[in-house]
Regions:
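GHKL (Bergerat-fold) ATPase N-terminal catalytic module, capturing the glycine-rich phosphate-binding loop
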Residues: 1-189, 193-194
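Compositionally biased amphipathic helical and low-complexity segments enriched in hydrophobic
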Residues: 50, 313, 337-340
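Short, hydrophobic, well-ordered secondary-structure elements
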Residues: 115-116, 333, 337
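Residue-level signal for short segments within beta-strands and strand-turn junctions
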Residues: 126-128, 230-232, 344
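A short, sequence-level motif marking secondary-structure junctions
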Residues: 139-147, 245, 251-257, 341-342
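Glycine/threonine-rich ATP-lid/beta-loop region of ATP-binding domains
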Residues: 172-333
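Single conserved hydrophobic/aromatic residue that forms the stacking wall/gate
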Residues: 340-350
């Protein structure tokens, strides 16, 4: 006699809001999915955080709190939605760890359940570049939150619609050439709260800091740029102070190296003058101690290069780990690179 596992409808909670127990992690996973889809830009927008009807309405309206994550990646067609997005634990990362000239960043197939962690409803809009129509998939996560031992997750029927550009605009979504828009509605967490004499936006500030981890500090040298933008229109209109606004609104940059300049000792070497010279600068806590400009003996091979080596004391190491979530020894340690060269002398380390 053969047996098999049963996927009870409560599986959604186990791999959704119960597993992903942090809002920042949930949003980061969704941004990683956009990165893996070759998006050049991802916009994260919070709507109706201050005044909404979340507690007074059963479903949702135009005044209900929303988190909208929009990317310009490759997008999906109905086969992608059916065979990939709705296929629990399906992950492109399992098949290939590198695509679109990028190392894939997403988790192993459960990132889409981050939407459940963040809100009660989801409207997923998507379009591939070659298509003239938009696909809308609607999910009400409450449909999976029933106490029924016999009901399996595949018993919940999900419907999709094909939308024209006009129909998309009527739903308040700006048309796009390709990509995905996740409209997460009726947010489960309180992202801001009133604290006399102003709104406390610390949770949004913390999100911005957390998302910096996905941005390469060396992005200026990367061919494939990836931008993350955080928006909260209610507070952008209200807050006229540019410095305060920059804490959680606008493009997210990883400034860890810039901050390290004022907390560590560094040696910076840059090839200049089309490879003719090298400029070496020694700095301590942001102050130049010594510099020297010399002839580049390898001008035939190196025309344009820049290298910065930081010496981190215990305080600087702790700061780096707090900012990036990575121990310095696991990020760019000279000792680590030496081990790679010894074990794989032909491998190029960039």
């Amino acid at each position: 006699m053969n047996l098999h596992f049963i996927t009870n409808v409560q599986l959604k909670n186990i791999i959704g809001k119960d597993l992903i127990n942090n809002d920042n992690i949930a949003i980061l996973e969704l941004v990683k999915n956009a990165f893996d889809a070759n998006a050049k830009r991802t916009d994260i927008s919070f709507v109706n955080l201050k005044n909404n009807d979340d507690l007074s309405i059963e479903k949702y309206s135009s005044r209900t709190s929303r988190l909208i994550i929009r990317d310009n990646g490759v997008g999906m067609d109905i086969n992608d939605i059916k065979n990939k997005w709705l296929n629990i634990a399906y992950s492109e990362k399992k098949k290939k760890s590198y695509q679109h000239n990028r190392m894939m960043a997403g988790a192993k197939g459960v990132g889409r359940f981050s939407c459940d962690r963040l809100g009660e409803f989801l409207n997923l809009y998507t379009k591939k570049e070659e298509s003239s129509e938009f696909i809308l998939l609607q999910l009400n996560w409450r449909q999976f939150e029933v106490d029924d031992e016999k009901k399996e997750i595949q018993d919940v029927v999900l419907e999709y619609e094909i939308l024209s550009t006009t129909e998309l605009e009527m739903r308040g979504i700006k048309p796009f050439k390709h990509g995905v828009v996740l409209e997460i509605i009726k947010l489960r967490s309180q992202w801001v709260y009133w604290e006399q004499p102003k709104w406390n936006t610390e949770k949004l500030v913390n999100l911005r800091t957390y998302l910096e981890r996905l941005i390469n500090p060396n992005q200026a040298f990367e061919k494939n740029d990836f931008g993350i933008y955080l928006n909260a229109p209610e507070f952008e209109e209200e807050n006229k102070n540019a410095e305060e606004k920059a804490k959680f609104i606008g493009r997210i940059e990883n400034s860890v190296f810039e901050k390290l300049n004022f907390k560590a000792t560094s040696i910076e070497c840059e090839v200049q003058d089309n490879g003719a010279t090298t400029l070496t600068t020694l700095k301590d806590k942001g102050e130049t101690i010594f510099w020297i400009k010399e002839k580049n003996e390898f001008s035939d091979f190196i025309k344009d290069a820049k290298c910065i080596i930081f010496y981190l004391n215990p305080y600087s190491k702790a700061f780096f780990t707090k900012q990036t979530g990575i121990r310095p020894v696991n990020y760019g340690s000279i000792y680590l690179l030496s081990l790679i060269h010894i074990s794989e002398p032909t491998r190029r380390v960039v």
